[in-house]
């Protein structure tokens, strides 16, 4: 009888150990992807958006300006990184493009250029038949240009104006305002992040010492949370909005992870600042102040260093951008000695 009981306990403990082990996130892997670009010393490329198997890059050149738009976009590169094919979409203007999304076979992008000490922006739909301007306006500076994102497979954009913030939906050639947040401004460049079904943005609300994060879905604002410190960057995962906290010149950093479902918030110290945060699935990627990459799991508060480039250790800490691939992984763009390299990261 004692032997049976002992075996039963061993079996139960084994199940518990397996259960705990199964909760450990899988080891992330980084697979290099051949670059679709061959750029001259005067050219530069910026990834704008990414989906499963495809991405969009803006390729342009420095225009010699000392302020305002410093680049002109020459063309967009539609890139299928799964099979390596790509095609160019000429821009044929003096504008600069920093925000874009896919809309099935179409492209939507926001371009801008200097106009009488202000910034003139346009929302463009690009199809096989040509380009159509859907909306336009002016902003006081380039960091007030609208930011595009996708919600429930529908193109959207966040607009900052003197009267407050607006979220607009793009349906074919029609643009409609679906949310207004009055009496607040953007504390930095117009930035929004989406996991496909919810989205988040930061706003400076009257009377708040620091930024307030708004978490929304197609029905409107789900919740808003005033943050306790200045924000480095922020991101959204399937379940959380993660905000890196701390002033750039501070010695102490932390984060707040806000559960989208009920608003419960976890606050903890971070050994490094969280810069260039991006979320996908159940994880976040970011770089620290030395551009060393890290992966963070908000549901367990586990943080690990991330090895991307295994060929040359000295090339680990180079300027890197992360983009969700829409399937729980990421596409990384790394600038090594003014040459762009790409990796797909499975997390």
Where are these regions (language model features)?
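Short loop/turn segments that connect beta-strands within beta-propeller blades
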Residues: 80-84, 126-130, 170-173, 216-220, ...
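A short helix->beta-strand "capping" segment at the edge of beta-propeller domains
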Residues: 25-45
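C-terminal motif of bacterial Sec signal peptides marking the signal peptidase cleavage site
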Residues: 14-17
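Bacterial signal peptide processing site
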Residues: 19-21
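Structural motif
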Residues: 64-77, 115-124, 162-168, 207-214, ...
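Repeated scaffold domains used in trafficking and secretory/extracellular systems
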Residues: 42-52, 94-104, 139-152, 184-195, ...
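A short beta-strand motif characteristic of beta-propeller blades
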Residues: 33-39, 85-91, 131-137, 174-182, ...
